[in-house]
């Protein structure tokens, strides 16, 4: 009997997992890919996922680089040498123009400093800008509402900053002339009244001559500081007689004094007027500087006027920067962004910086490499600091480190 073997079964003696024959047309080899429903093989394309990831990354980058975010970035701003010149209407002109007094040339620099601010209305920043600022030690990122409230337009903010700049310039003139003895008194002119005082008593343009409280002595304040000191001695609700010069004639006004706001920290009472305070002098100064706002250059403006109107070179040829508000009595007050201002001054080449003593906590640890920073509380101290730097003897000057460790 002839034995017929099933060709699909292994031959005798062959391993069970070794094929001994193939069906017609079949090719031995790897397992064929699974077919799709349509009969075509399903093939994976990993490069498609790569392209999708790249596209999403590009879209994310574009969004980060173009969509504004509610942040403000403060960084080092420009500096101006107040003893130098600026371009105005295509011509070079002195930044400070003094009239009514002899002026003297200066060889050094007294730099006013600024902060560059981005993120307020009209100057948006993006997430990419913010990320860059996080890694820049000279920049700081703040919430927008801390710097520019949403209900204030760019135009309104500009107007406020320009008014602050103008006021600081006027006050700098008064402080400088009083410091140098070119004026020995001030003119106190009413420019407005508070809501509590209302209209009908003072008029804009009234010049305050004297104040007499009921049952008290008459005082003729010759400076704003004297007026402030007098008002601290008069209780709220006291009837006073105020003599003003109105249209060239003395006019007597009777009123009761007002109570200061609970959070004002002031003692005594108020007249309820806003004053324009100017030095009683024929000397005056104007400023050729546009597109810069805020009150923080007052101290440097005052130093510039002093250098221009006194013999010799106050700076001794040194490059000195600084910042600080100024009051008519010469008090130098705190400002914002002092770290950025020091960095900007260093970038401009200044080796010395005058900082308000009230800002020293923000100065220590942020001084640029190679820069000497000195604390000043008033204009007289600032003049002494510049003179010490010019003479090469700063041993008597106060550092911010010394202020913070008192």
How does the language model describe each region?
Residues 1-47, 138-142, 151:
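Terminal targeting segments of Actinobacterial cell-envelope proteins
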Residues 48-68:
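Hydrophobic membrane-insertion alpha-helices, especially the h-region
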Residues 73-106, 113-119, 123, 134-194, ...:
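PDZ/PDZ-like peptide-tail recognition elements
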Residues 166-221, 331-336, 348, 357:
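PDZ/PDZ-like domain segments forming the peptide/carboxylate-binding groove
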Residues 228-270, 365-391, 396-404:
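PDZ-domain C-terminal substructure recognizer with occasional recognition of PDZ-binding tails
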Residues 308, 328-353:
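Glycine- and Gly-Pro-enriched alpha-helical subdomains that act as flexible
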Residues 355-366:
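Short, glycine/polar-rich helix-capping loops at beta-to-alpha or helix-loop-helix junctions
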């Amino acid at each position: 009997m002839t034995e017929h073997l099933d060709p699909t079964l292994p031959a005798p003696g062959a391993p069970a997992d070794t094929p001994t024959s193939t069906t017609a047309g079949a090719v031995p080899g790897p397992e064929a890919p699974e077919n799709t429903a349509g009969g075509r093989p399903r093939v994976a394309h990993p490069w498609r996922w790569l392209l999708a990831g790249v596209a999403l990354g590009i879209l994310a980058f574009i969004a980060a680089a173009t969509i504004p975010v509610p942040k403000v970035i403060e960084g080092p701003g420009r500096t101006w040498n107040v003893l130098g010149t600026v371009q105005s209407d295509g011509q070079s002109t002195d930044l400070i123009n003094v009239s009514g007094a002899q002026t003297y040339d200066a060889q050094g620099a007294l730099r006013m400093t600024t902060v560059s601010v981005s993120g307020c209305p009209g100057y948006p920043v993006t997430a990419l800008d913010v990320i860059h600022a996080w890694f820049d030690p000279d920049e700081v990122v703040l919430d927008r509402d801390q710097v520019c409230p949403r209900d204030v337009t760019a135009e309104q903010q500009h107007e406020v900053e320009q008014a602050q700049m103008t006021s600081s310039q006027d006050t700098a003139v008064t402080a400088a002339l009083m410091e140098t003895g070119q004026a020995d008194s001030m003119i106190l002119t009413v420019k407005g009244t508070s809501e509590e005082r209302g209209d009908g008593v003072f008029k804009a343009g009234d010049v305050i001559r004297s104040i007499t409280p009921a049952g008290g002595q008459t005082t003729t304040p010759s400076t704003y500081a004297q007026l402030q000191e007098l008002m601290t001695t008069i209780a709220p609700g006291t009837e006073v007689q105020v003599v003003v010069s109105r249209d060239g004639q003395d006019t007597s006004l009777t009123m009761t004094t007002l109570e200061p706001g609970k959070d004002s920290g002031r003692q005594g009472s108020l007249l309820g007027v806003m004053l324009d305070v100017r030095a009683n002098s024929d000397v005056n100064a104007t400023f050729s500087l546009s597109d810069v706002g805020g009150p923080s250059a007052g101290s440097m403006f005052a130093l510039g006027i002093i250098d221009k109107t006194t013999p010799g070179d106050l700076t001794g040829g040194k490059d000195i920067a600084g910042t600080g508000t100024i009051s008519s009595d010469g008090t130098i007050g705190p400002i914002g962004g002092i770290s950025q201002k020091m960095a900007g001054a260093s970038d401009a080449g200044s080796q010395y910086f005058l900082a308000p003593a009230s800002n020293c906590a923000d100065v220590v640890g942020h001084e640029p490499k190679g820069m000497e920073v000195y604390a000043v509380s008033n204009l007289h101290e600032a003049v002494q600091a510049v003179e010490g730097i010019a003479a090469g003897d700063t041993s008597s000057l106060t550092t911010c480190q010394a202020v913070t460790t008192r």
